């Protein structure tokens, strides 16, 4: 049986291996050809909005969508994804750290995550597409 571990220790070990980025740096990387990937649940995207240009990928299929050898990969995902920055974000930057580590294990050496997640991006005043309102609102 594997030894018991707490998630905080696993998260700290994972983050020590990543070159995590602040919101402004993530925006610069995306403008320079990096790939921003939103792994938040649909409910949070509907509540808070989205980052323009970010690819939306459910966390449970992330590896298949960003693996260039997978028949289930996203359109446009090719061998270049192994070398380019891939910046994942969740709501506050926890799940995205673990997800970036999974992508690095696939060989995506530029995989990392956004420190503070979507909430930090929004607090930094970077562009956000607002959530729908009125009849088009999800709630």
Residue ranges and their predicted role:
Residues 1-35, 42-85, 94-139:
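Rhodanese-like catalytic fold shared by cysteine-dependent sulfurtransferases
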């Amino acid at each position: 049986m594997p030894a018991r571990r707490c998630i905080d220790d696993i998260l700290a070990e994972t983050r020590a291996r990543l070159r995590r980025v602040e919101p402004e740096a993530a925006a610069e990387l995306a403008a320079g050809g990096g790939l921003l990937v939103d792994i938040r649940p649909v409910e949070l995207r509907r509540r808070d909005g989205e980052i323009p240009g970010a690819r939306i990928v459910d966390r449970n299929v992330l590896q298949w969508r960003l693996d260039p050898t997978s028949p289930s990969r996203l359109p446009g995902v090719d061998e270049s994804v192994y070398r380019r920055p891939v910046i994942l974000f969740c709501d506050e930057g926890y799940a995205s750290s673990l997800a970036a580590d999974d992508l690095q294990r696939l060989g995506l050496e530029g995989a990392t995550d956004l420190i503070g997640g979507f909430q930090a991006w929004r607090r930094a005043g970077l562009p956000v597409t607002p959530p729908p309102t009125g009849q088009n609102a999800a709630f």
